[in-house]
Design a protein with these regions (language model features):
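Structural/interface elements that position substrates and couple domains in central-metabolism enzymes
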Residues: 1-142
Length: 142
């Protein structure tokens, strides 16, 4: 048995969906701004949540990183809020973290300004004068 069998057809598809969901979030933000008569390149966007899951300060393998990188490539100004994260090393030290030449930055344009990114702990300060909010882990109330 292998990937040629019908049993495992869903596995590569699931991996593809998981790998591209962050890019889809950036596209949804772009589309929402467009519907409001705004363009990404002239917008300030708040990202709520930098870590890979709720209530932790670990940003390794965070889907939010790709959202930030794609929106930055589109020209957006990004402000970041996460009460558990003090530094987002993948952005701040992108030339050397996790290792030289291994940053996601190499796949996106206009990433230089992300080195000056600061994670804000004060939600009110983060939301001041933003055009949109990207909250990757948001759920709709039931």
């Amino acid at each position: 048995m292998g990937f040629e069998d019908d049993i495992f057809k869903i596995t590569p598809l699931a991996i593809d969906i998981n790998d591209t969901r962050s890019l889809h979030v950036a596209e949804l933000v772009r589309d929402a701004l467009r519907n409001m008569g705004k363009v990404v390149a002239a917008s300030k966007i708040a990202l709520l949540g930098a870590s890979y899951r709720e209530d932790v300060g670990d940003t390794r393998y965070s889907g939010s990183e790709i959202v930030v990188r794609k929106l930055t490539e589109m020209g957006a100004e990004i402000v970041i809020h996460d009460p558990y994260v003090k530094h987002w090393w993948e952005l701040e030290k992108q030339e050397s973290y996790p290792a030289p030449g291994h940053s996601w930055a190499r796949f996106f344009r206009n990433q230089e300004k992300l080195q000056d990114s600061k994670v804000e702990n004060d939600l009110q300060a983060t939301l001041k004068s933003v055009d949109a909010v990207s909250w990757p882990s948001a759920t709709m109330p039931t």
